[in-house]
Curated annotation (Swiss-Prot):
It catalyses: (S)-4-amino-5-oxopentanoate = 5-aminolevulinate. The lineage of its organism: Archaea, Thermoproteota, Thermoprotei, Thermoproteales, Thermoproteaceae. Signal peptide: none annotated. It comes from Pyrobaculum calidifontis (strain DSM 21063 / JCM 11548 / VA1). Its EC number is 5.4.3.8. This is Glutamate-1-semialdehyde 2,1-aminomutase. It is found in: Cytoplasm.
Length: 441
């Protein structure tokens, strides 16, 4: 059967499935980032293994990796075996297990600031409870967050950034009462002066500052070290807590996370993604005397039937054991470095202005001149060009992060051969993009 006829048959089937999906899900998907609105239909996953996704568009080298949840590679045999062994013993008890204690001990060994912790089921739950705990501990109500930082979909943090140095309580979602977010202040990321000014304005009403130490939800924005140090100094000065949201960076940029990388120690930390091995999990934790306020020991309430779910714990233990072996980071980090260098070189050769950002096993690129140091720099990039490249890349067997506001990731399965395969495909993509749009970005 000719390829074009086969393609039409596949596309027609996906179109029918998407219509069925739209009949039962808002927008046809169960999370907005999966909608891929720049494509005729969302991608439909069939399977995943190693560095590859198998979809209705064929086999794709995956650089999205479930938005950073996968670091060993898809369907890693040790994770699969650990999960199968747990399933054979039962998959939910709602009781204490030895495995969750062992998992917590391993996390604490690598992230010493997390002396005690509570397992929850997502990054959103983790940050929501961390903010609640900070308010309960300090007896204060106000929090500061940063433009371009995403901390989940709960009401405390869905707050807009404005045009001034600080924005006070403007919800980013319908359905959030203004009274809920009026005590959330948004400040520009990487701007020490604006942050110090906001802290002085809030003063002794400030309960916490929550930040992504490496911003990974608005593209990839690396922190100025002095910015992170200022967060620590100012929160200590006014008696507020510093919360590092390491849902993306925890165990991704190293065993000690971003706090280990930069040497800035928070009071509370949130974790997720990598530590679940692809299964739902979240963690909030910190100094013992703060965490002791969490129920049942203290008055700050958290509970959940699925907290410390045995299957997620089993997967997480398998992942941490692999990470402790040392080879995962060297392979994954080298892959991201080579992808970043390769994309920069390809764009230059074809005649596009790009800015490439990279750290550990994370990278992203932007069609623009200059540099990317703030969310505003990301907003000023050519998003349409990125989306067109993303669409073309799928046709050549590469699945990149679906927006310039997301991040590309690599795993231990992204060997030198896989990177070479991806860069070979992207060379064709960049040349095709150049023919379509012409000129510089």
């Amino acid at each position: 059967m000719p390829f074009d006829v086969q393609f039409l048959k596949v596309f027609d089937g996906v179109l029918m499935l998407f219509e069925r999906a739209k009949a039962v899900f808002p927008g046809g998907v169960n999370s907005p980032a999966r909608a891929l609105k720049h494509l005729p239909t969302p991608l439909v996953a069939k399977a995943a293994s190693g560095p590859y996704l198998y979809t209705d568009r064929g086999r794709l080298v995956d650089f999205c990796l479930a938005f950073g949840a996968i670091i060993l590679g898809h369907a890693h045999p040790k994770v699969r075996r650990a999960v199968e062994e747990q399933l054979a013993r039962g998959w939910i008890y709602a009781l204490l297990t030895e495995e969750e204690v062992l998992f917590a001990e391993k996390i604490r060994a690598h992230v010493p600031s997390v002396e005690k912790m509570r397992f929850v089921n997502s990054g959103t739950e983790a940050t929501m409870n961390a903010v609640r705990l900070a308010r309960g501990f300090t007896g204060r109500d106000y929090i500061i967050k940063f433009d371009g930082n995403f901390h989940g979909s709960h009401d405390y943090v869905l707050v807009k950034a404005g045009s001034g140095a600080a924005t006070w309580g403007i919800p980013t979602s319908a359905g959030i009462p203004s009274d809920v977010v009026k005590m959330t202040v948004v400040v520009p990321y990487n701007d020490v002066d604006a942050f110090v000014k906001a802290v002085r304005e809030v003063g002794d009403r400030l309960a916490a500052v929550i930040v992504e130490p490496i911003a990974g939800n608005y593209g990839l924005i690396l922190p100025e070290v002095e910015f992170l140090k200022a967060l620590r100094e100012e929160t200590e000065r006014v008696g507020a807590l510093l919360i590092f949201d390491e849902v993306i960076t925890g165990f991704r940029v190293g065993l000690g996370g971003a706090q280990g990388l930069y040497g800035v120690v928070p009071d509370l930390t949130t974790l997720g993604k990598v530590i679940g091995g692809g299964f739902p999990i979240g963690v909030f934790g910190g100094k013992s005397f703060i965490m002791d306020l969490v129920a049942p020991q203290g008055p700050v309430y958290n509970a959940g039937t699925f907290n410390a779910h045995p299957v997620s714990i089993a997967a997480g233990l398998a992942v941490l054991e692999e990470l402790e072996g040392g080879q995962v980071y060297s392979v994954a980090n080298d892959a991201a470095r080579r992808m970043a260098e390769g994309i920069r070189d390809l764009a230059e050769r074809v005649g596009f202005d790009v800015v490439v950002k990279h750290i550990a096993s994370m990278f992203q690129f932007y069609f623009k001149k200059g540099d990317v140091k703030t969310p505003q720099d990301v907003r000023e990039s050519n998003e349409k060009l990125y989306l067109k490249l993303h669409e073309l890349a799928i046709g050549h067997g590469v699945y990149l992060a679906p927006s310039q506001f997301e991040v590309n990731f690599t795993s231990a399965a992204h060997t030198a051969e896989v990177v070479e395969e991806a860069l070979g495909a992207l060379e064709k993509v960049f040349r095709e993009l150049r023919r379509e749009v012409g000129g510089n970005s």
